[in-house]
């Protein structure tokens, strides 16, 4: 089910979000709606994590797989061309979201069902209604001009 357009997170925002989520080497990051794979590539290259990307659009899934291959990360990052509602998230240590508030609302039951205690969920600009964030931080992508500004929500599964 299509629930959000492809709008890539800027690299500086991705790095900030992964640091906020305290992503560690060897952990597994799930990117729900992984687009071109940029978040997964940074997670693997910069943080030493493993990644699983879920992308409904076949063209974007193929692009992500190509980008992952070009970066030599085929052994650490996987792309699933599938609907995020069909995916088991039990192996996730961190879940990355850049959806919409309504899309977060729709994926919330899957997160509540599958995530183990302590799993971190980091969301770009859109909160998860009914969940209490551990942190809410504003990140200015270009401080010299004062915008664009991004709100980052960090949640931990109790």
Locate the predicted segments by residue:
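Conserved SAM-binding motif I beta-strand of class I
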Residues: 50-55
């Amino acid at each position: 089910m299509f629930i959000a357009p492809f709008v890539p997170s800027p690299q500086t925002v991705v790095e900030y979000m992964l640091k906020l989520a305290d992503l560690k080497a060897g952990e597994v990051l799930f990117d729900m709606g992984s687009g071109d794979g940029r978040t997964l590539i940074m997670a693997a290259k910069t943080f030493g994590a493993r990644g699983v990307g879920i992308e409904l659009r076949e063209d974007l899934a193929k692009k992500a797989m190509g980008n992952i291959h070009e970066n030599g990360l085929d052994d650490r990052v996987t792309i699933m061309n599938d609907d995020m509602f069909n995916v088991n998230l039990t192996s996730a240590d961190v879940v990355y979201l850049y959806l919409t508030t309504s899309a977060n609302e729709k994926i919330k039951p899957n997160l509540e069902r599958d995530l183990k205690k302590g799993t971190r969920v980091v969301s770009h600009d859109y909160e998860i209604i009914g969940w209490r964030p551990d942190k809410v931080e504003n990140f200015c992508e270009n401080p010299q001009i004062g915008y664009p500004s991004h709100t980052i929500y960090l949640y931990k599964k109790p």
